[in-house]
């Protein structure tokens, strides 16, 4: 992944004007004006679709568990795009408010953990699980809480460790999903996970690839959209309509 990032180094090309130089591992990259605008737009665009999509799941809910899961997932999905947009807007237009920007950056990273947990909630709550696998319903929230505590104490200090935490948080609950008796939607989940993994190349490429963080945002949106489709189709769509969709 990181070898590919080194190959895609645009610092000595005509596109270098769209990005700033790389910074040491312990410092935060400062985007150009172009990149700031792209960072805001690439997540702001998805706020309304995420609200509409979450509302759709709520209205398709047939029981309390489906309603609760729709709320949890919807809050995680909308929260991700809203918090990211607010942080990048403040970072761009109000960068002199250092403490506010720093706090929002921490919240932005914390929300990712809860977004991952919320993305698994419908699968863990609405699908049949084994006696041991059912513990993952609450374990994902413990993992999200641990990740939040880590960000609070070690924000931007050990970036590779932070990235590893996101990867573990993203893949560990998937082991339970794969073991479910009903595996409908697995391919969509794997496709969404692939979008996130490919996006990590750009997540670690600020200063090498112009608009790297904005491209990462797009991969996040594609991954989230794929996972939303799987949740809508296999967990909320009435069985009669599922048959029509699959044809």
Swiss-Prot record:
This is Monocyte to macrophage differentiation factor 2. It comes from Mus musculus. GO terms for cellular component: Golgi membrane; perinuclear region of cytoplasm. The keyword Transmembrane helix applies. Residues 61-66, 125-133, 181-182, 232-247 are lumenal. The chain crosses the membrane at residues 40-60, 67-87, 104-124, 134-154, 160-180, 183-203, 211-231. Residues 1-39, 88-103, 155-159, 204-210 are cytoplasmic. Keywords: Golgi apparatus, Membrane, Receptor, Transmembrane, Transmembrane helix.
């Amino acid at each position: 992944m990181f070898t590919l990032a080194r190959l895609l180094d645009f610092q000595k090309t005509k596109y270098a004007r769209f990005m700033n130089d790389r910074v040491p591992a312990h410092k935060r990259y400062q985007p150009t004006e172009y990149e700031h605008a792209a960072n805001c737009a690439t997540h702001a665009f998805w706020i309304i679709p995420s609200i509409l999509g979450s509302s759709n799941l709520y209205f398709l809910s047939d029981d309390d568990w489906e309603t609760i899961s729709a709320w949890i997932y919807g809050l995680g999905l909308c929260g991700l795009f809203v918090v990211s947009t607010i942080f990048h807007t403040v970072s761009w237009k109000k960068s002199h408010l250092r403490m506010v920007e720093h706090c929002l950056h921490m919240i932005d990273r914390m929300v990712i953990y809860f977004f991952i947990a919320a993305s698994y909630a419908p699968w863990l709550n609405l699908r049949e699980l084994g006696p041991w696998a059912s513990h993952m319903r609450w374990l994902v929230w413990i993992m999200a809480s641990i990740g939040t505590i880590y960000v609070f104490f070690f924000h931007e200090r050990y970036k590779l460790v932070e990235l590893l935490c996101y990867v573990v948080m993203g893949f560990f609950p998937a082991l339970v999903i794969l073991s479910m008796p009903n595996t409908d939607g697995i391919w969509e989940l794997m496709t969404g996970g692939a979008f996130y993994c490919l996006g990590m190349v750009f997540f670690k490429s600020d200063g090498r690839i112009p608009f790297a963080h904005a491209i990462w945002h797009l991969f996040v949106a594609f991954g989230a959209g794929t996972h939303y489709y799987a949740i809508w189709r296999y967990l909320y769509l009435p069985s009669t309509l599922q048959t029509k969709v699959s044809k």
